[in-house]
């Protein structure tokens, strides 16, 4: 797999050109930069994709950035595949839940809107990189707004990474107990089938040792494996739609054959439950947009992939993004649609876990679970790398590597994410909170703010600047509106829970 420099300290990108065919001739000295990984571990040298850390200690005061011409090496097809890896993440598991709480028609409208807005955001980001003279996300923040801009970019990327890491561990918490019960052929509630204990065991025995390594290069291969896992998962979701009857009969367990003739029922309520709905509004509808934004975030990976692209130009990179987003759009739509049509109102925030309502043991689903568990477990250490680098930098640590500091930061981060996974009630809350905050910042707010500030040749009255300004305003509305509604839902649930407890 092609690799490209993730950090550049000198650029000479012509503002008025449609191409940016320059590379850096010197690099920063960080030892710990990792590659972006959504539900994958693809590496663009030292870049992370759903997560990412482009903290730099460049001399930013210079007017001009000089660089030698150094063409990228990634083909169009490879770039499309890499960006697909960057987009695809655990968010796909929450899309059926979003559809179940918006209806098919409303979900499709929202999915199309978020995909188009994400592509527009990529356009703004590429143009800003050309005009601003940097292919480093956080450096664009510094050039636009100084230290606050750099911190905003850094914190947003770190939050997105932390949310991604938590969502992966949540998948371990949900799915590993089911796998263990299947292998032991047992339904008891022993400690070794408790998700909280299993998350701690997996963290200490696998994730912590891998996270303490100074180099995770070999884990870059998990990216392709992760994407294949999700394709396999999608195929299984479509296949199972035609195997699982609706409504689900009580005690519908261990069905492996003869499901082509679902049980007859005269219950009109059950029939109503099995009828797909096109528009739904309820208390959970507020999570739909944050789940979608969480699923489409890949923007910190765009710039290093742009630098890596062979014969690069803005138009070519935009076409790469168009093809990748179209592919992920189709996968997301199919996964959401068939997951929703299978379970309708009964779908859970994490789709794969919903199948445990139907099958106590199923070989195909067991293979899917094992594959997904392997992928997410190997991805967590890669996602943790840039977070640790960011913390290192913010603490003002010296560039000299220190094992005690390295170990302390790693352990502290893993302790925090484990506490979050153990005490947060559902993965829906992680999708919702991170999608409404960090993802909204990375898709809507930061690219438009950087564009407005750094692209000088267009006046504020130009169509482009007006469009970017409206996009910025919409980003703030999405973030504040979603966060307010989600917090209100949390408060309502907490009060309802207290009343229910008090009633007994």
From Swiss-Prot:
Localisation per UniProt entry: Cell membrane
Keyword Chaperone attributed: no
Cystine bridges: 246-274
Region (Regulates protein turnover upon amino acid deprivation): 1-99
Glycan attachment residues as annotated in the record: 254, 258
Extracellular side of membrane: 100-105, 181-189, 240-285, 344-364, 428-429, 489-504
Catalytic activity: L-alanine(in) + Na(+)(in) = L-alanine(out) + Na(+)(out); glycine(in) + Na(+)(in) = glycine(out) + Na(+)(out); L-serine(in) + Na(+)(in) = L-serine(out) + Na(+)(out); L-proline(in) + Na(+)(in) = L-proline(out) + Na(+)(out)
Transmembrane segments: 80-99, 106-126, 162-180, 190-210, 219-239, 286-306, 323-343, 365-385, 407-427, 430-450, 466-488
Topology versus the membrane: Multi-pass membrane protein
Topology, Cytoplasmic side: 1-79, 127-161, 211-218, 307-322, 386-406, 451-465
Regulation: Inhibited by N-methyl-D-glucamine. Inhibited by choline. Allosteric regulation of sodium ions binding by pH.
Pfam family, one: Aa_trans
GO molecular function, one term: proline:sodium symporter activity
Function comment: Symporter that cotransports neutral amino acids and sodium ions from the extracellular to the intracellular side of the cell membrane. The transport is pH-sensitive, Li(+)-intolerant, electrogenic, driven by the Na(+) electrochemical gradient and cotransports of neutral amino acids and sodium ions with a stoichiometry of 1:1.
Matching PANTHER family: AMINO ACID TRANSPORTER, SODIUM-COUPLED NEUTRAL AMINO ACID SYMPORTER 2
Stated family: Belongs to the amino acid/polyamine transporter 2 family.
Domain notes: The extracellular C-terminal domain controls the voltage dependence for amino acid transports activity.
Record-given protein name: Sodium-coupled neutral amino acid symporter 2
High-level lineage: Eukaryota, Metazoa, Chordata, Craniata, Vertebrata
